[in-house]
Amino acid sequence: MKKGLGTFIKAILAGFCIGLGGNVFLALLNTNKMLGAVLFSVGLFTICTHSLNLFTGKACYILDNKPSYLGTLCIIWLGNLVGACLMALLVHLSRLNASYTEAAQSLVATKNADSLGSLFFLGVICNSLIYIAVDGHKSNPHDLGKYLALMLGVTVFILAGTEHSIADMYYYAVAGELFTGQGLLRLVIISLGNVVGGLLIPAGKKLAAALGA
């Protein structure tokens, strides 16, 4: 119970950090999307530096854990949701509310107009890049390489137009459309796509190793 609560708290902090990155992306969405995508990486940088629990990152390591890890992932997902909502609440209580809400609503409108299949596959693509980012940070022996992996992975997934479930939690919350049937359904579909995407490269590596490569 105590461990589960600690996991949940670290997940709340991770969702909050993704909201931090989402803030700067919304601020620059209509003026300098490239810079916004680069600076969004402050969220993942903070998460990896402080060993926080981000659903999209942790999903990449399902194959390295016991089946009970899936329950831990559900706790992390819920914690990320709480953290993203906390950041959205702070935005709504500030002078940033109007401009950020307008920007978030434009992003959410695109997602709501998309098909569930498209959102799933965009989630797959996104978390393939997140795996590159987090595993690069984990395994690269050089500090510069660690942080380049994070920055490049995040920047590419944003500019490519893919779907990150926790960032989307934040955008839906700011747009005021999170707790609707449509919003929650899309988040679940994107989350499932993220799980599949996070497993593609590690599963491929394990298969290649099993075949003697």
Give the label of every model feature segment.
Residues 1-213:
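Alpha-helical transmembrane segments and their helix-helix packing motifs
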